[in-house]
């Protein structure tokens, strides 16, 4: 498939924004459970603002993928059958909850609303945090299922697509939370850094499983089945047209297989071992710069990973354009 940069930035920015928001809520839940010291409300408010800006940037990137942006609102009409429509509906809900969560913390609306059990007092920020967490997880699923639900693109049609979007997005968000904490000198950098490492390693396991699965795929369609010829050796000599077309532009990435393999190595290094090593090194030497570097290195790797994700999908129609695709 053709990797559109608008969709690459959409998915990576949304993932980082959702992940950062989940990191803020996780930190608050740990503080409520007294596993972490309580933080100033402004800490969560600023973190939520950054998460909201990432979500807005991702939404803005999506408009560059539309032929008629003024009709974007119609994308929500098919919510009963379309994961894209569901994403269009869930995204503004997530953005509204992130905004409300940040505002509630900024104005310190922390008076208890009700009590659960003997000790847990639920205030507005905690309630919004839980609702936002549920919505964010739903958004991860909706975004990933846009691709995982496409049956004829066998590289995508697997639950591993959903796990990749979830864990890689969460890892980048927690890595950003560690960078944010390091930048302002907050001691939670260790907490967020540790969670970022855990999520990164889980994401590595998921991505490697996805790559291994795709390497063993047996495609249902071949040249023989496409044209109804049983001969063992069928080779296309020409695509039947003298120039390119929509089919050759939109359903093929136009790069060599060797480039894909090199990029795969690059993103596997940038997304996984380097950030983990940088976080570990920051613990040893007490550097506040290394978590920040770790986030930017990982995010750059995620852009390459997402490009490769789209490029790896082999559309069956390319059987008719083998001299190009």
Swiss-Prot record:
It is found in: Cell inner membrane. GO terms for molecular function: dimethyl sulfoxide reductase activity. The chain crosses the membrane at residues 5-25, 43-63, 87-107, 126-146, 165-185, 186-206, 266-286, 290-310. InterPro entries: DmsC (IPR007059). Belongs to the DmsC family. PANTHER family: ANAEROBIC DIMETHYL SULFOXIDE REDUCTASE CHAIN YNFH. This is Sulfite dehydrogenase subunit C. It comes from Allochromatium vinosum (strain ATCC 17899 / DSM 180 / NBRC 103801 / NCIMB 10441 / D).
């Amino acid at each position: 498939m053709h990797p559109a940069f608008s969709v690459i930035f959409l998915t990576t920015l949304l993932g980082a924004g959702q992940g950062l928001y989940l990191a803020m809520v996780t930190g608050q839940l740990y503080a409520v459970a007294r596993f972490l010291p309580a933080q100033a409300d402004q800490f969560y408010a600023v973190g939520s603002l950054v998460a909201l800006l990432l979500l807005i940037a991702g939404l803005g990137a999506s408009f560059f993928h539309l032929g008629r942006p003024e009709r974007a609102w119609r994308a929500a009409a098919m919510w009963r059958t379309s994961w894209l429509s569901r994403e269009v509906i869930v995204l503004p809900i997530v953005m509204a909850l992130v905004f409300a969560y940040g505002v509630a913390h900024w104005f310190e609306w922390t008076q208890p609303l009700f009590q659960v059990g003997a000790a847990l007092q639920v205030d507005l920020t905690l309630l919004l945090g839980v609702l936002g967490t549920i919505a964010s997880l739903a958004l991860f699923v909706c975004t990933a299922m846009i691709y995982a639900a496409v049956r004829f693109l066998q590289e995508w049609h697997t639950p591993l697509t959903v796990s990749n979007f979830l864990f890689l997005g969460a890892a980048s968000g927690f890595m950003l939370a560690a960078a944010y904490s390091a930048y302002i000198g907050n001691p939670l950098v260790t907490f967020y850094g540790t969670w970022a490492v855990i999520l990164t390693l889980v994401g590595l396991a998921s991505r490697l499983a996805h790559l291994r699965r795709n390497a063993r795929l047996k495609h249902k369609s071949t040249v023989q089945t496409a044209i109804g010829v049983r001969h063992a050796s069928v080779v296309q000599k020409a695509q039947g047209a003298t120039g390119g077309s929509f089919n050759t532009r939109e359903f093929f990435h136009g790069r060599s297989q060797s480039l894909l393999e090199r990029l795969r190595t690059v993103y596997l290094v940038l997304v996984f071992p380097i950030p983990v090593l940088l976080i570990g090194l920051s613990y040893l030497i007490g550097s506040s710069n290394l978590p920040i570097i770790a986030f930017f290195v990982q995010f750059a790797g995620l852009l390459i990973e997402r490009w490769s994700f789209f490029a790896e999908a082999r559309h069956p129609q390319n059987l008719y354009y083998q001299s190009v695709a």
